[in-house]
Swiss-Prot record:
Protein name: Endophilin-A2
Protein localization: Cytoplasm; Early endosome membrane; Cell projection, Podosome
Residue ranges, annotated region (Interaction with ARC): 218-254
Primary location recorded for the protein, binned into one broad class: cytoplasm
Biased composition (Basic and acidic residues): 245-263
Organism: Mus musculus (Mouse)
Alphabetized SUPFAM superfamilies for the sequence: BAR/IMD domain-like, SH3-domain
Topology versus the membrane: Peripheral membrane protein
Amino acid sequence: MSVAGLKKQFYKASQLVSEKVGGAEGTKLDDDFKDMEKKVDVTSKAVAEVLVRTIEYLQPNPASRAKLTMLNTVSKIRGQVKNPGYPQSEGLLGECMVRHGKELGGESNFGDALLDAGESMKRLAEVKDSLDIEVKQNFIDPLQNLCDKDLKEIQHHLKKLEGRRLDFDYKKKRQGKIPDEELRQALEKFEESKEVAETSMHNLLETDIEQVSQLSALVDAQLDYHRQAVQILEELADKLKRRVREASSRPKREFKPRPREPFELGELEQPNGGFPCAPAPKITASSSFRSSDKPIRMPSKSMPPLDQPSCKALYDFEPENDGELGFREGDLITLTNQIDENWYEGMLHGQSGFFPLSYVQVLVPLPQ
């Protein structure tokens, strides 16, 4: 920084201290300017909080949001184009219903109904994904651009104005000790910054109809989502009512137990009056330590080398997103990387993926 720049910084700091500590009066801005500054400040706070709440409305599960952010970061590092989407609760419910509906089979009324409901829930999840995309494009992104560009630019102008005001007030207080030309230049710069800040704030407040249009786009997207959701649910309700009517009109099947097979008692002329008994085998020294000629085969798992980082699965883990590694309790997994404090990356049966740290017990830790 040049000597002139250092002097200017000293002037501003000295004036600020005299105002904060000594109670010196600085140049007052007019009421119209203060009113605009207050409105811009309220607008900035409103936009910032509305953005946060909108994201929470679309993606209410904070754990899923954090996990999605982590997976997207990993995908960018790996250069993957397709990123996993937010796991909609309707989609998770639909997959659960479809899975159990298939297990019950087509002969079960409940199983068929679960299949119908599950497919409808999955359609609702797709509609919800479309809502997320539309709201992001037409509401979240424009407001984020407003924060990053217009509001940030206004804050820059206001900060510059405050610095030039302090410089002008310091020189005005020492009028006669500094050249008049230097004081005049300080005043011109202060008035120039004030005009630029006023213009930028005025333009923002006068064009707030753009924010109204963006809010309207949010409501339109919600209306479209709810219309489609109502249509899907009405179709599902009709299907289920039709199944109830068909099941009620169908004659009930009577349960007929299978006839018992005759039980042969065999030879009843036993000395003790009971059932015939097989003679007990003789126990010898060699036979007491073996139950059969064939050795018992114990289940085995392919273990990674003892010097290779590895872990053992404590529970079953079902992958819900692309890039996750599923396993069963007792599986031995080769560790390749630790993503963060909650997630590992590893390999099992030739497949690589991510899995939660809490599901496994580390046998050989990763090198530090």
